[in-house]
């Protein structure tokens, strides 16, 4: 039996990856384990409140520290490394929702990162005393932009309702997304380019923000 471990945040990308693993990648008898890592960020409580009971919550790396608030996309340094390593102790196939570099350019999610992490894990697994079953790391969305990933998900029979209930916001007010941050705008644009409503109320209309026009034009070129 193969255990598929999915890094899950509740956003569009991880929602699509989890559905992809459950419907097309996992075989009969395989186990699929979605894991949410609580990094104790300002948005973490809002994300956790929306999680389905089937999602496993893990707080073992909550000590990593605060994100860089000066960046448009708050980044917790080294989080992907630690999350992948921990996931590899739970199963032998690990997935996370990294997009094409056109959409998200990052040094801890590209193909070189994946290759190095897989090599490291397989080196450790070569010693049977560690009890690891040759873990592999996958990013099934790495060839697609966010709107492309949404379009492929819908074309494959994915439920629009799952996308509309997704949540991505760095500065929510209680459970209401701000509408102004990069995460809100990217989610809004990806749904709009696929003729879907946002599925939520925003504090600020994303179309009135400084990011909207740029992101809409940039993401539209990928379709």
Model-derived regions: residue spans:
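ATP/NTP-dependent adenylation/nucleotidyl-transfer catalytic domains that generate, transfer
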Residues: 2-6, 58-64, 71-75, 133, ...
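ATP-dependent adenylation/nucleotidyltransferase module used to activate substrates
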Residues: 1-159, 184
